[in-house]
Structures are given as structure tokens and as C-alpha cells.
């Protein structure tokens, strides 16, 4: 008998799952599913408790949905990726598996694991799929057959390649001929978990699909105008579903073009399409530059920057007590919800690196430990952009002024007051510099003074980068 095994990883859905669809194509084959939890590996990768809670809930939903299709989900738990190789081998042997199907992951440890799995399964046909990207790594290259290092040329080539042949979404599998089965007992991950707002980050696959549809209908067209203002619900909040594979990027693309067909030609919705392409860009980058997965900067000379070791400054940044309201409100949003508005991710990252001169890798790790949408490629790409260490990054002399950023993107301080209750009585725009208002009003605020003076910090940071660039 032909037995197909689908190995689920970051693709916890039935719809548009390339590996699952391929495994179910042969109607006479027996189909099994497998998920391997690796708690120690997750801890090494700083996976957040909220993301673990989301995965736990999605796994249980997936187990029920697969059972309705007649596909049992086998759950196993081992320490790390190395141990998971033996588990796959064991499951294949116990169930006389003839074919293994899985969707590629592009991070360096995951790729090494998959190489070892295929090496161990000499008598099993292994098929991998580029499921977590719209266009696979290698499909968009320069004329010299190299990976693009600048986003805009990559985007233009990506769009040209997409117009030549757009990948379709595949349907969810039909019920197997053997009929539905009873699902196994509920899964509980052996990893710290923390609750989150399921209204913003849906657990069920159909709810995530509905959220995508609603955003593309009502939000994508206005995304360009609203995306930078954290007090406005102007972003999609789909990042968590994409990070865990509750949605596919192809689903996002097709729904966007169904609702905003002009997005492909620079019209309404095109700016959100750019965000999907940035996601592709960072995934392609880590495939061709695996050192990015090992905490190495893309621009080599930036590794010579003399970062400050200041645990006290790092802690107040993490806690949202720097004395800069927009930075502190953003960090408290992150700590309270597991999510942060994208404009604020840039502001807080710039502040840590270029006002406090703290190594960007400290921020990268902390974000991953808190984010429900933690994604190595996107998080690393964002931090290296802010720190001017990455490909196509902001130039090192571009340093955000946290006060003017707050004034520009939270003009009346609505977002700040939402997350900093100690500033709720500070009126109007002066909330961006509350220490000045308090001094004039003769009021004592339960809010810290700025931990650094921005102009002085800027001078210090420029000197540190310039010394590194010159090799001093």
C-alpha cells in the first residue's frame, strides 16, 4: 500500500498548503500527518510564549480539521531539530511510509535538518515545496544570476516574473475514501504559553481567511494613507497568521488582487503588495546569505562598531521607561499584546541602536521573545535595516529623532496616552515632551526624564559608525 506522510511545520492550515495537496492527490493512498514540537530549539530561537499559544491553538484546530478529512495527525515532542530527524525516520518505519511531503523552511538550522532527514530516508521518496513564498528563491535573480541586494530592483524583477506566471492557490483536500475519523486527544505544547487577543490574531483558519478578506476589501486601498499612524487601525494584523502558516502569501496575493486589481500596476493596494514583496525579499536573502541566520551583519564593517554594554539602558528600553513617550508607548504595546505597529518597530529599533548605541542583536532577540508574529527573516531584516548593517538598509547617518517621530505620527498623542497612563493628563501635543510641560505647570509626573539627550547621542553614534567604517 502507498502511504503518504505530510510533515507540518510552519504551515498550519488546510487551504493552499502545497505539501498537503500533493500528498492527497493520489486518492488511493493512505495519508498521515506529523507535527514535531521542539521546545529546546524554540527556546534557542527565542520563540515568544504568545506565539507558542497561537501554535498550540492552531495545532488543535488543524488536528480536528484533518480528522474530518480522514487524516490522523501524529504529534511528537523532542528537544531539537537534530532529534527530530530520528522521529521522522521512526514514524516512516512504523507506518511503512513510501512518500514524505513537506514545505521548505529557509532558515539555516531548518535546512540542515531537512538535508539530514532526506539522507536518513533512503527508501522513502521525499518531496519539498516552496510554500511560504509566492516566488521561490532563485526565481528572481540579477543578470549575473546573483541574489539582488537592493529592494527596488528586486521588486521590479519580482513583479515582472509574477506577470509571466502567477502561482495559483490549491484547494483544501477532500475527505479521504476511508471517511472521517475521531481526532486524537488535545495537544498541549511543553513550552511557556501566554494568552493573546484572538479578535486581532484569529486562531481558526476560517477566521484568518475572513480577516484577510475584510482587510483587502476595506483596508488595503487606504493602507498607504493610514499605515504610519499607530492610533489608527490601518494595518492588516495578518503577520501572525503568516508567521505560523495559518495563511499563505499566495492567499494574500490573490485576495488582494481580487479586491484591488490595480495593485499590481501601482494603484490602490500596491503599498500593501510592497509589504508582501519585502517579506519575499528577506526570505530570499536568508537562503542565499545563511550567515544572516547566525547573527552576522550583511555589511561586514558594521561588525566593528563599538557597542555600549549598558544593561540598565537595555532594561528601561525593554520596559518602556526611557523618557521618550513614543518609544515607551510602543514598547508597552509590545509587552502587553505581543505585537507592535510597524512604524513603531522602526522608531524603537532606531532608538536602541542609534540613541543608546546598544547592539542591534539585543533588540532582535528581545523582539523575537515577545512578538506573536516573530519571524526570523523579517525580524532580522527589520533590525538590520534600522541599524544600517543590512542590505539596502537606512544609511548609518539616518537617525530618527524620537520626539519628532512622535509628533509626526501620533500628533495629538492619542496612542501615547493609550499606553502611558501616567501621561493621560498631559494636554495636547506637549505630551511628546512632558518634562517641559511639567516644569512650566509646576507638576510632578510619575514618568522618567529622558535617559539620553538625543542630539548628544546622535553625535556619539555617528562617531562610532565612522570609526568602524574607517577600520579604527
Regions found by a protein language model. Name each.
Residues 1-166, 268, 463-468, 472:
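Trp/Phe/Arg-rich N-terminal binding region typifying the photolyase-homology
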Residues 51, 55, 319, 323, ...:
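Residue-level preference for long, well-ordered alpha-helices that form the structural scaffold
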Residues 233-422:
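Active-site-proximal binding-pocket segments
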Residues 46, 314, 445-448:
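Short coil/turn segments at secondary-structure junctions
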Amino acid at each position: 500500500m502507498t502511504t503518504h506522510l505530510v510533515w507540518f511545520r510552519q504551515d498550519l492550515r488546510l487551504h493552499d498548503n502545497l505539501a498537503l495537496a500533493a500528498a492527497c492527490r493520489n486518492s488511493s493512498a493512505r495519508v498521515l500527518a506529523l507535527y514535531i514540537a521542539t521546545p529546546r530549539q524554540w527556546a534557542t530561537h527565542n520563540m515568544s510564549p504568545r506565539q507558542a499559544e497561537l501554535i498550540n491553538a492552531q495545532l488543535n484546530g488543524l488536528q480536528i480539521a484533518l480528522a474530518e478529512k480522514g487524516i490522523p495527525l501524529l504529534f511528537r515532542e523532542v528537544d531539537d531539530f537534530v532529534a527530530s530527524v530520528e522521529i521522522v525516520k521512526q514514524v516512516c518505519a512504523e507506518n511503512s511510509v513510501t512518500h514524505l511531503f513537506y514545505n521548505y523552511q529557509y532558515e539555516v538550522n531548518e535546512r540542515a535538518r531537512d538535508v539530514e532527514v532526506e539522507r536518513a530516508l533512503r527508501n522513502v521518496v521525499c518531496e519539498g515545496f516552496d510554500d511560504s513564498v509566492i516566488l521561490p528563491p532563485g526565481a528572481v535573480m540579477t543578470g549575473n544570476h546573483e541574489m539582488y541586494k537592493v529592494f527596488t530592483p528586486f521588486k521590479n524583477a519580482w513583479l515582472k516574473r509574477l506577470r509571466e506566471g502567477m502561482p495559483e492557490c490549491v484547494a483544501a483536500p477532500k475527505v479521504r475514501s476511508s471517511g472521517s475519523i475521531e481526532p486524537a486527544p488535545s495537544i498541549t505544547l511543553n513550552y511557556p504559553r501566554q494568552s493573546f487577543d484572538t479578535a486581532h490574531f484569529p486562531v481558526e483558519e476560517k477566521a484568518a481567511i475572513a480577516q484577510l478578506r475584510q482587510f483587502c476589501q476595506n483596508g488595503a486601498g487606504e493602507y498607504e494613507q493610514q499605515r504610519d499612524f499607530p492610533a489608527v487601525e490601518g494595518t492588516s494584523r495578518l503577520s501572525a497568521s503568516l508567521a505560523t502558516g495559518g495563511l499563505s502569501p499566495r492567499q494574500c496575493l490573490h485576495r488582494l488582487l481580487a479586491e484591488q486589481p490595480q495593485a499590481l500596476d501601482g494603484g490602490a493596494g500596491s503599498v500593501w503588495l510592497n509589504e508582501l514583496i519585502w517579506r519575499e525579499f528577506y526570505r530570499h536573502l536568508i537562503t542565499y546569505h545563511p550567515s544572516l541566520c547566525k547573527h552576522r551583519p550583511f555589511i561586514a564593517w558594521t561588525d566593528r562598531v563599538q557597542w555600549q554594554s549598558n544593561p540598565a539602558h537595555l532594561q528601561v528600553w525593554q520596559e518602556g521607561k526611557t523618557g521618550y513617550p513614543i518609544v515607551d508607548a510602543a514598547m508597552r504595546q509590545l509587552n502587553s499584546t505581543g505585537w507592535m505597529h510597524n512604524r513603531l518597530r522602526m522608531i524603537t529599533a532606531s532608538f536602541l541602536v542609534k540613541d543608546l548605541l546598544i547592539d542591534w542583536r539585543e533588540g532582535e532577540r528581545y523582539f523575537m521573545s515577545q512578538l506573536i508574529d516573530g519571524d526570523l527573516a523579517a525580524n532580522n531584516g527589520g533590525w538590520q535595516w534600522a541599524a544600517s548593517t543590512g542590505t539596502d538598509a537606512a544609511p548609518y547617518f539616518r537617525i530618527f529623532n524620537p520626539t519628532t517621530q512622535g509628533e509626526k505620527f501620533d500628533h495629538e498623542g492619542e496612542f501615547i496616552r493609550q499606553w502611558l497612563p501616567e501621561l493621560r493628563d498631559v494636554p495636547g501635543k506637549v505630551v511628546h515632551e512632558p518634562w517641559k510641560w511639567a516644569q512650566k505647570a509646576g507638576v510632578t509626573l510619575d514618568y522618567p526624564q529622558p535617559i539620553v539627550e538625543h542630539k548628544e547621542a546622535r553625535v556619539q553614534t555617528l562617531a562610532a559608525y565612522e570609526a568602524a567604517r574607517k577600520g579604527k
